[in-house]
């Protein structure tokens, strides 16, 4: 008798395109980044109650937006309630800060937005993002415009996409660093962010690029990390680590034992991210 066919895990490259879970279904129906036009031209005018549920609980994340939990609902109760019972009409907005570095103009803008729209509060996260709370959908277009005037954005700060790239916050200033990875990080950010090629991954994809000697980016728990090292001939470059993560299925990244030149980093990053996109498990979101 022929052996029973094993059920696929949703790997695109192996032809396992069905069945779709709810997250894969809304991503197939419309790309997450497309929701910006609806936010600016429809929802900001018509208000919270006009928002399509698939946008609200799915695609909004591609632009760094999550609904806040209603006051008085503890985290332990959320599994027993419907989404509509949990959601408040305010949003958390996450702003992407590549490498965790801000100019003085950018920092002033971040602070001004917090004062005007976020009840004088902004979080600095452990992945070098900034988060606002108490954001109304009506105010999102203006916040975006003000962020973009100083070169900031909430694009792909959440969702199944390449997340903000971690870097050493004192890159270029640390006397003990192996190399200043700022230019490499920015070149990789240009490939990763707002790129339709990587706009639909199986899950979030976390990156760290650092040339400092103290390993401040915790490279062991990122999906891909480039760690500053000296090559065999003493030339500065990067050691490559892949497959790390925390959350419900924590694991330590594996060192691949290859030396990556600074100019190779964006292409290597794209190759690894492409493997995750095409071979990552999409059927069960708890599997990696």
Each model region followed by its residue ranges:
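Compositionally biased, intrinsically disordered low-complexity regions
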Residues: 10, 66, 74-81, 153, ...
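Generic, well-ordered alpha-helical scaffold segments in large soluble proteins
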Residues: 4, 12-29, 38, 42, ...
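Short amphipathic beta-strand starts and helix->beta connectors
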Residues: 73-81, 108, 112-119, 242, ...
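Small-residue-enriched alpha-helical segments and adjacent helix-cap loops
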Residues: 2, 6, 61, 68, ...
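Short, flexible, solvent-exposed loop/turn segments with mixed acidic/basic and small polar residues
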Residues: 81-87, 118-124, 278-283
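Mobile "lid/hinge" segments at catalytic clefts and subdomain interfaces of large enzymes
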Residues: 2-18, 27, 199-288
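Low-complexity, intrinsically disordered regulatory regions of RNA-binding proteins
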Residues: 4-68, 73-74, 182, 199
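Short glycine-/aliphatic-rich beta-strand segments at the starts of folded cytosolic domains
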Residues: 41-101, 163-172, 250-258
């Amino acid at each position: 008798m022929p052996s029973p066919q094993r059920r696929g895990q949703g790997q695109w490259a192996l032809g396992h395109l069905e069945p779709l879970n709810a997250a894969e279904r809304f991503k197939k129906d419309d790309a997450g980044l497309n929701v910006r036009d609806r936010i600016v031209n429809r929802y900001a005018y018509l208000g919270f109650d006009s928002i399509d549920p698939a946008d609200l609980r799915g695609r909004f994340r591609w632009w760094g937006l999550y609904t806040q939990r209603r006051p008085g609902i503890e985290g332990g109760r959320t599994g027993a309630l419907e989404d509509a019972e949990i959601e408040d009409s305010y949003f958390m907005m996450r702003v992407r800060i590549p490498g965790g570095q801000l100019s003085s103009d950018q920092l002033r803008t971040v602070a001004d937005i917090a004062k005007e729209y976020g009840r004088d509060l902004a979080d600095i996260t452990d992945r070098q993002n900034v988060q606002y709370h108490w954001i109304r959908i009506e105010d999102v277009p203006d916040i975006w415009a003000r962020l973009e005037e100083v070169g900031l954005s909430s694009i792909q700060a959440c969702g199944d996409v390449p997340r903000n790239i971690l870097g050493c916050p004192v890159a270029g200033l640390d006397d003990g660093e192996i190399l200043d990875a700022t230019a490499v990080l920015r070149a990789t950010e240009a490939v990763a962010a707002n790129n339709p090629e990587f706009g639909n991954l199986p899950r979030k994809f976390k990156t760290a690029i650092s040339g400092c000697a103290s390993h401040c980016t915790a490279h062991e728990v990122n999906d891909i990390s480039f760690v500053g090292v000296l090559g065999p001939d003493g030339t500065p470059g990067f050691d490559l680590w892949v497959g790390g993560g925390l959350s419900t299925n924590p694991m330590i990244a594996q060192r691949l034992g290859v030396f990556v030149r600074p100019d190779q980093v964006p292409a290597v990053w794209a190759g690894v991210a492409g493997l995750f996109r095409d071979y990552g498990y999409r059927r069960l979101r708890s599997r990696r």
